């Protein structure tokens, strides 16, 4: 795909405590490489990737294929950058909420991140995937899978255990989030009867949408 040759521009935001592996996770997803020497993100950074999203009919048959330009925003986890980070929440259509499986504290702080999301995201119930990263460090693990799945069930969101080092579930977790977003947008399109192809500059927003309201469902 050339520049501008896409149907949707989707902005995803990775957030979580500093050091949970957001930067290496996104690098693995976009470049399929692992770089353990990334320095801590200062403020905001982002990576990009073009994908093709295939829809399915009600009977399970193949539907239309959409070309999607993903912008994956990488946020600083440190407290001093928190006000800058939350300023980007309203522009994101989906969130990769990440904690470190080798850090119980980063898992406990997921609740704080959820509170900030609910207060600052484009709506009160945005599309979120919970990610327990560094699954390859088995001997250092502090958070068990049951704990994490129970928390994800409480919030009604998918949960994945990932590893930027091995690539485990990295692509699958992002694809799951994209699927949630595209299905939500499809419902909006059906209700408002707007064209099914949205120019990238609109970021997938539907004509007539009221930005001031924080209702997610159309």
From Swiss-Prot:
Query: At which residues does the record annotate a lipid attachment of kind S-geranylgeranyl cysteine?
Result: 216, 218
Say which enzyme class the record assigns. Answer: hydrolase
Which positions form S-S bridges? Answer: 123-188
CDD domains in the record? Rab27A (cd04127)
Please write the reaction equations for the catalytic activity of this protein.
Answer: GTP + H2O = GDP + phosphate + H(+)
- MF terms (GO), sorted A to Z: G protein activity; GDP binding; GTP binding; GTPase activity; myosin V binding; protein domain specific binding
How is this protein situated with respect to the membrane?
Answer: Lipid-anchor
* Task of the protein: Small GTPase which cycles between active GTP-bound and inactive GDP-bound states. In its active state, binds to a variety of effector proteins to regulate homeostasis of late endocytic pathway, including endosomal positioning, maturation and secretion. Plays a role in NTRK2/TRKB axonal anterograde transport by facilitating the association of NTRK2/TRKB with KLC1. May be involved in targeting uroplakins to urothelial apical membranes.
Q: What is this protein called?
A: Ras-related protein Rab-27B
Which species does this protein come from? Answer: Rattus norvegicus (Rat)
Q: What is the lineage of its organism?
A: Eukaryota, Metazoa, Chordata, Craniata, Vertebrata
What gene name is listed for this protein? Rab27b
